[in-house]
């Protein structure tokens, strides 16, 4: 059995394969998320992984998740981050995703997404967004950086 996670983001696409085969790769998304999804299918085929095989399950997330026509399931980025954060850092943690188009801050409590914030501007305002998030979380920007440095995942 192979489990494949595909995140087609606005600037980069990430793929992780777990199971009887293990692999990961990153590639630029480019102008067309749909073409990127097909490029990923081709790369997996080169690795002798057939996404149509009954023993392969594909989950897609990210801005381009809808165009991964071979995905068995699509999941929002917030949900994926929550599950990944719980797996890597425990049931109570904070995840910060600085992406190509936005930044998300996700808070987990008891293993569930408790709250999340997202900037509503392009990534040009990312620094200001971190400052606003620190203020919202009741910490200084320096404390936020220290907290990030203490992360183990």
Give a label for each model feature.
Residues 2-43, 113-122:
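Short glycine-rich, Thr/Ser-proximal phosphate-binding strand/loop in the N-terminal lobe
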Residues 38-42, 79-86, 127-134, 142-145:
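Predominant activation on well-ordered alpha-helical scaffold segments within soluble catalytic domains
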Residues 110-149, 153:
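Glycine-rich phosphate-binding loop plus the immediately following alpha-helix
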Residues 63-115:
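Conserved phosphate-binding catalytic cores of ATP/NTP-utilizing and phosphoryl-transfer enzymes
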Residues 3-7, 55-57, 93-97:
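Short glycine-aspartate micro-motif
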Residues 19-29, 48-79, 114-116:
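Short beta-strand-loop/turn "lid" adjacent to the catalytic site in phosphate-handling enzymes
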